[in-house]
């Protein structure tokens, strides 16, 4: 019989030699164990052989050949073991020796255990007792082998990427920001000078969670300096693609720095401004090194005075000083290159643009809410100016003034931006190109903003549908002729000609149809005014700390009002006063006694029992209807089929929002009070919401950051700022321009 080595190398000749060498060594080791009575009783040969077989297959060996190899090796080892058992002569009681070994293995000292095992005549290794066998494998070599295997498997599968909470993500939870930053961006500042920062990732697959594929044989191309909007329906995998890029699960060049605004900043005692400055790890390290060198130079000046001028000690100090001076010059040059002296002013400008006052910038980060810490994360990323900036729904955490600032900032951003967003106005302002993720692929619309993309996409779809329909008609015509004359002697030649034509026609797939969702708010009966009226309303913790002062606002049945302003200026508070959830310190709130209000909060999910279905939750929270009536009502908001019967924890964010819209309409409201209704809805959902609000015969009052939704629905703009709420004369775009002009006058937009 051929040796184990020759068998393995013959069966796995195409894979990396380091893997075959490891397999040969492992099998030879198993062979040696068959001569040891104690160890042979502790090893399951079939399990061990299968372990090595799986390793060979993962490295690229043929499954059929490996199966044949494993059967041969297992048969050989089993036969060898039986023959050796008959020849072995053991001294003493074997079971007693095994008991002694198990007792020893519970001892604390590994070195003592291994010595004791040796004295018993058992060649054991406590480091590998989990496998109950000795292994002489070099762990470093094994790690190297596994890395090579992984690379080969990736190459064989066209850079297949399976993303399921990668190790790197888990590591981030355990380590600090600096370590994670350096792990993702290992190259020092300035090391990428002269290198192309275009990104081209060819033919890769992307999976998520339990193996669901979201991209198949896809290509990703990002030209340096372009700003890409990544769009697609909710749940299509856009955020997963960003995470795979940010963790370098995909093959992004190492010299391209990456930052992903994904998680809110952890709060501590660091001031907001300093936390932004600290985000640039390279600058932080250079400044720290500079400070250490300067401290050492001061120490050397003191030491020098203790020695004679021509002494050996002074010469050593002078040599050290020369080295440190040279190093200090290098550090200084790098700090100049990164304009370190302007860093604080730039960081302050970014923070101010995102809504942090000068006073707030000096507050510790742990004093801010989660939403404001998300803004800090965004500010830190903007300050660092990575080569590739990844943003996931950035406008969801911002108000209209901050979104306006962010859009202006990104329009002059010198590097590459890839942002997921459903905010049309934001994408129209920012994006130079659109990437459309759908049907496990990425389609590129170069040089197009969102509106142009939307029009072009629809034209492409119509053209594809027209081409498909025409071919189906032509195919039918050819097939009818063939069926009619195939066996007709006079026409058979023509029939054969048409058969050839039919065979040569390209196979066209029916064009993908965009999913449509319909929202329908129920009609309400008319009411006589006043509907909701606020007169000289003031609200605060006390009269010396008023959040709102002397507010006058009138909401009618035909009102379409947008309430805008910076976060924290009292917009949601005003809604709660109108809902009678809060009482004003002074002033009057008049409401029609027959008034019914549908109230949508931005935290609507908090009030839902996600462990139940939408139908069950609605029947418990809003009793009085049959399950069939609840299902029909949910269908008016796109929750159709079995969706209403599934546990709500299985629904997407957009689907949960639609359940919330359905719930608020159960009482046939006269007025819809909506607090950030566009959050979690994709473009299709937003279109449906806008149309439904346009057709609603009651009044609408909304707080929203989505300029497109406001422009499409609202006729009045009311601005909450500095404790007042006043009507703005103009459109939402006029208000946006007013915000930018004010920021520009203060030097905020220009400074960055």
Swiss-Prot record:
Q: Which residues form the ABC transporter domain?
A: 199-464, 532-748
- Annotated residues for binding of ATP 1: 232-239
Amino acids binding ATP 2: 565-572
Q: Which UniProt keywords apply?
A: Acetylation, Activator, ATP-binding, Nucleotide-binding, Repeat, Stress response, Translation regulation
CC per GO annotation = cytosolic ribosome
BP terms from Gene Ontology: cellular response to histidine; positive regulation of phosphorylation; positive regulation of translational initiation in response to starvation; protein unfolding; regulation of translational elongation
One MF term in GO for this entry? translation initiation factor binding
Superkingdom to which the source organism belongs? Eukaryota
List residues, modification N-acetylalanine: 2
Q: How does it assemble?
A: Interacts (via N-terminus) with GCN1 (via C-terminus); this interaction stimulates GCN2 kinase activity in response to amino acid starvation. The GCN1-GCN20 complex interacts with GCN2 on translating ribosomes in amino acid-starved cells; this association stimulates GCN2 kinase activation by uncharged tRNAs, and hence allowing GCN4 translational activation and derepression of amino acid biosynthetic genes. Associates with ribosomes.
UniProt record similarity statement: Belongs to the ABC transporter superfamily. ABCF family. EF3 subfamily.
Extra facts:
Present with 14600 molecules/cell in log phase SD medium.
Q: What is this protein called?
A: Protein GCN20
Native organism:
Saccharomyces cerevisiae (strain ATCC 204508 / S288c)
């Amino acid at each position: 019989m051929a040796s184990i080595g020759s068998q393995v190398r013959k069966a796995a000749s195409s894979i990396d030699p380091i893997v075959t060498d490891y397999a040969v060594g492992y099998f030879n080791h198993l062979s040696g164990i068959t001569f040891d009575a104690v160890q042979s009783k502790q090893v399951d040969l079939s399990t061990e052989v299968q372990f090595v077989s799986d390793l060979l297959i993962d490295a690229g060996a043929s499954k059929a050949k490996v199966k044949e190899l494993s059967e041969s090796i297992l048969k050989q080892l089993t036969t060898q073991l039986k023959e050796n058992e008959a020849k072995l002569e053991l001294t003493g009681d074997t079971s007693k020796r095994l008991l002694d070994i198990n007792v020893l293995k519970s001892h604390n000292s590994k070195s003592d255990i291994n010595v004791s095992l040796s004295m018993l005549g058992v060649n054991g290794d406590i480091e590998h007792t989990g496998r109950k066998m000795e292994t002489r494998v070099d762990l470093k070599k094994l790690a190297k082998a596994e890395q090579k295997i992984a690379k080969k498997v990736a190459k064989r599968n066209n850079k297949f990427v399976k993303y399921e909470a990668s190790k790197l993500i888990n590591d981030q939870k355990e380590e600090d920001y600096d370590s994670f930053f350096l792990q993702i961006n290992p190259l020092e500042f300035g090391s990428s000078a002269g290198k192309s920062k275009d990104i081209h990732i060819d033919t890769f697959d992307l999976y998520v969670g339990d193996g669901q594929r979201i991209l198949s044989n896809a290509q990703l191309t990002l030209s340096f300096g372009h700003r890409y909007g990544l769009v697609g329906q909710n749940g299509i995998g856009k955020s997963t693609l960003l995470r795979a890029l940010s963790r370098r699960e995909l093959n992004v060049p190492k010299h391209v720095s990456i930052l992903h605004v994904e998680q809110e900043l952890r709060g501590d005692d660091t001031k907001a401004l300093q936390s932004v400055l600290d985000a640039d790890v390279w600058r932080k390290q250079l400044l720290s090194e500079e400070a250490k060198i300067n401290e050492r130079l001061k120490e050397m000046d003191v030491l020098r005075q203790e020695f004679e001028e021509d002494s050996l000690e002074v010469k050593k100090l002078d040599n050290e000083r020369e080295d440190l001076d040279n190093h200090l010059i290098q550090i200084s040059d790098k700090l100049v290159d990164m304009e370190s002296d302007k860093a604080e002013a730039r960081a302050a400008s970014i923070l101010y643009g995102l809504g942090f006052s000068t006073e707030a910038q000096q507050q510790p980060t742990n004093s801010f809410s989660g939403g404001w810490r998300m803004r800090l994360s965004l500010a830190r990323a903007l300050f660092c100016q990575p080569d590739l900036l990844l943003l996931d729904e950035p406008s969801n955490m911002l108000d209209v003034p901050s979104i306006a600032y962010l859009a202006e900032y990104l329009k002059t951003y010198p590097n590459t931006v890839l942002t997921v967003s459903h905010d049309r106005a934001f994408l129209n302002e920012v994006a130079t190109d659109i990437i459309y993720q759908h049907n496990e692929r990425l389609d590129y619309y170069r040089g197009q903003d969102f509106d142009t993309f939307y029009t072009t996409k629809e034209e492409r779809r119509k053209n594809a549908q027209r081409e498909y329909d025409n071919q189906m008609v032509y195919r039918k015509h050819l097939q009818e002729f063939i069926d009619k004359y195939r066996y007709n002697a006079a026409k058979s030649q023509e029939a054969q000609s048409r058969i050839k034509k039919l065979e040569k026609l390209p196979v066209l797939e029916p064009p993908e149809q965009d999913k449509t969702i319909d929202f329908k708010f129920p009609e309400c009966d008319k009411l006589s005014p006043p509907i909701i009226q606020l007169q000289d309303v003031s609200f605060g913790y006390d009269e010396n700390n008023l959040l709102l002062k002397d507010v006058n606002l009138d909401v009618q049945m035909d009102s379409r009002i947008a309430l805008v302003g910076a976060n924290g200026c009292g917009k949601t508070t005003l809604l709660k006063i109108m809902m009678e959830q809060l009482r004003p310190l002074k002033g009057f709130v008049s409401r029609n006694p027959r008034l019914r209000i549908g109230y949508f909060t931005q935290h609507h999910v908090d009030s839902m029992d996600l462990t139940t279905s939408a139908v069950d939750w609605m029947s418990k929270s809003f009793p009085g209807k049959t399950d069939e009536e609840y299902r029909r009502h949910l269908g008016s908001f796109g929750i159709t089929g079995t969706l209403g019967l599934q546990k709500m924890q299985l629904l997407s964010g957009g689907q949960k929002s639609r359940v919330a819209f359905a719930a608020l309409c159960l009482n046939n409201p006269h007025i819809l009070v909506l607090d950030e209704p566009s959050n979690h809805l994709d473009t299709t959902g937003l279109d449906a919401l806008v149309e439904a609000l346009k057709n609603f015969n009651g009044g609408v009052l909304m707080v929203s950051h989505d300029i497109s939704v406001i422009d499409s629905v609202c006729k009045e703009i009311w601005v909450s700022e500095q404790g007042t709420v006043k009507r703005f004369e103009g459109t939402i775009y006029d208000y946006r321009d007013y915000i930018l002009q004010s920021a520009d006058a203060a030097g905020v937009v220009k400074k960055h």
